[in-house]
Swiss-Prot record:
The gene is MAPKAP1. The modification Phosphoserine is found at residues 128, 186, 315, 356, 510. Disulfide bonds: none annotated. The modification Phosphothreonine is found at residues 86, 398. Residues 2-184 are annotated as: Interaction with MAP3K2. Component of the mechanistic target of rapamycin complex 2 (mTORC2), consisting in two heterotretramers composed of MTOR, MLST8, RICTOR and MAPKAP1/SIN1. The mTORC2 core complex associates with PRR5/PROTOR1 and/or PRR5L/PROTOR2. Contrary to mTORC1, mTORC2 does not bind to and is not sensitive to FKBP12-rapamycin. Interacts with MAP3K2. Interacts with ATF2. Interacts with MAPK8. Interacts with GTP-bound HRAS and KRAS; inhibiting their activity. Interacts with IFNAR2. The keyword 4Fe-4S does not apply. GO terms for molecular function: enzyme-substrate adaptor activity; phosphatidylinositol-3,4,5-trisphosphate binding; phosphatidylinositol-4,5-bisphosphate binding. It comes from Pongo abelii. Keywords: Acetylation, Cell membrane, Cytoplasm, Endoplasmic reticulum, Endosome, Golgi apparatus, Lysosome, Membrane, Mitochondrion, Mitochondrion outer membrane, Nucleus, Phosphoprotein, Stress response. Residues 279-353 are annotated as: SIN1-type RBD. It holds the Pfam family SIN1_PH. This is Target of rapamycin complex 2 subunit MAPKAP1.
């Protein structure tokens, strides 16, 4: 055992004794603060002195280099073990073997058979590089496109070509629509024109895209340069234009409509438009009537009857009981279905089932309706929105926007940034198909500034009621508009609702009669 009182030697011994056993290198950091104290105790020598060692009183060497251990050299590759020469040589041999595998050795052999000069010449025959005369034949697709280029440059609808989605299928939302063109000849109108449009386009942009593609394909007859002269109607799969519904709103986005078949129809701006639109035939039937629009008086009564039956049955199959037409003024006298409307000299008829008569009291004489009422009934199918308040349970109200059209009723909540919605009911958007509507009645009218109406519809085999409030004028307009739509459609849900309501009324009347009878006997 050795006793040392020199701190310099002790520090050097601790730092250098554990070099091989300490992987962390913490031995070099032992008592590192004492180096500063030693420098203060033993200041460095003057520049004139030679050497860096300090002699103590006992003659022992006092100066040591304490920066790091003597066995560790500081460099950038500290901690990286160098590869030995053997490993480097083995790596070089491995690469040489891989290169030898990639190389293919071919042994040269002398040719035994002798070939003539002519045979050798035939192996490498000289090709003729003379220019061949141009072959006159069918034009290439590029030539045809270049010839059609001036036509495309003169297309007045070029601004709508940016809505063409044929080059964006799979990358951007697009919509494929089959468009029928009634303005074509009788043969061309049977085949639709397929248009691929961007989903973000409006109806007006789609009309312009249809006109652009129509003109680019060189179709005849030529279109009007004004896009506003055309509109889009709903069409059947066979190309028949559905005139029961109004044209699509030109300002609405096309992705809002789920129709895959449309028809491009020209808007009539001539003075004869009013007389053409006012040709309506009224067909009275059980539980309502229908207004059938005709183009002229040359239409046969059979076509009018088929349209009336299809209108009453809606999406159901037309097959079923047979019907006949009778003039409103001549009961029990069947109309010849092969005759024209012009020969009948009447505009009001009755739809009667075969083997039955109007004497049973099924039909009642309705008062003549004026043309203003007819126009109101027709305009009721046009979309119109109203701002009303929806009444919930506990008399809570929510401001909503009520949109009414011929095919559905939409209820969209109106967000109010100022009012706090913490204690209010959060209303979700509701869309009700017109075939599911049952009734719309005025529930309460307290004053001209406050009225309540009830909307009844079928949902999951159950009848639900929604209550709304607004001023009396708005409520009366909504009730009248919805009732016009219900009378013109005559859906099965509405008929079942009134039948169930009548059964409940009869059951209630029968119960009250039995109760009065028992009390009389007592």
């Amino acid at each position: 055992m050795a006793f040392l009182d020199n701190p310099t030697i002790i520090l050097a011994h601790i730092r250098q004794s554990h070099v091989t056993s300490d992987d962390t290198g913490m031995c070099e950091m032992v008592l590192i603060d004492h180096d500063v104290d030693l420098e203060k105790i033993h200041p460095p020598s003057m520049p004139g002195d030679s050497g860096s060692e300090i002699q103590g009183s006992n003659g022992e060497t006092q100066g040591y280099v304490y920066a790091q251990s003597v066995d560790i050299t500081s460099s950038w590759d500290f901690g990286i073990r160098r590869r030995s020469n053997t490993a480097q040589r083995l790596e070089r041999l491995r690469k040489e073997r891989q290169n030898q595998i990639k190389c293919k050795n071919i042994q040269w052999k002398e040719r035994n058979s002798k070939q003539s000069a002519q045979e050798l010449k035939s192996l490498f025959e000289k090709k003729s590089l003379k220019e061949k005369p141009p072959i006159s034949g069918k034009q290439s697709i590029l030539s045809v496109r270049l010839e059609q280029c001036p036509l495309q440059l003169n297309n007045p609808f070029n601004e709508y070509s940016k809505f063409d989605g044929k080059g964006h299928v799979g990358t951007t939302a697009t919509k494929k629509i089959d468009v029928y063109l009634p303005l074509h000849s009788s043969q061309d109108r049977l085949l639709p024109m397929t248009v691929v449009t961007m989903a973000s386009a409006r109806v007006q942009d789609l009309i312009g895209l249809i006109c652009w593609q129509y003109t680019s394909e060189g179709r005849e007859p030529k279109l009007n340069d004004n896009v506003s002269a055309y509109c889009l109607h709903i069409a059947e799969d066979d190309g028949e234009v559905d005139t029961d519904f109004p044209p699509l709103d030109s300002n609405e986005p096309i992705h809002k409509f789920g129709f895959s078949t449309l028809a491009l129809v020209e808007k009539y701006s001539s003075p004869g438009l009013t007389s053409k639109e006012s040709l309506f035939v009224r067909i009275n039937a059980a539980h309502g009537f229908s207004l059938i629009q005709v183009d002229n008086t040359k239409v046969t009564m059979k076509e009018i009857l088929l349209k009336a039956v299809k209108r009453r049955k809606g999406s159901q199959k037309v097959s079923g009981p047979q019907y006949r037409l009778e003039k409103q003024s001549e009961p029990n006298v069947a109309v010849d279905l092969d005759s024209t409307l012009e020969s009948q000299s009447a505009w009001e008829f009755c739809q009667v089932r075969e083997n039955s008569s109007r004497a049973d009291g099924v039909f009642e004489e309705d008062s003549q309706i004026d043309i203003a009422t007819v126009q109101d009934m027709l305009s009721s199918h046009h979309y119109k929105s109203f701002k009303v308040s929806m009444i919930h349970r506990l008399r809570f109200t929510t401001d909503v926007q009520l949109g009414i059209s011929g095919d559905k009723v939409e209820i969209d909540p109106v967000t109010n940034q100022k009012a706090s919605t913490k204690f209010w009911i959060k209303q979700k958007p509701i869309s009700i198909d017109s075939d599911l509507l049952c009734a719309c009645d005025l529930a309460e009218e307290k004053s001209p500034s406050h009225a309540i109406f009830k909307l009844t519809y079928l949902s999951n085999h159950d009848y639900k009621h929604l209550y709304f409030e607004s001023d009396a004028a708005t409520v009366n307009e909504i009730v009248l508009k919805v009732n016009y739509i219900l009378e013109s459609r005559a859906s099965t849900a509405r008929a079942d609702y009134f039948a169930q309501k009548q059964r409940k009324l009869n059951r209630r009347t029968s119960f009250s009669f039995q109760k009065e009878k028992k009390s009389g006997q007592q």
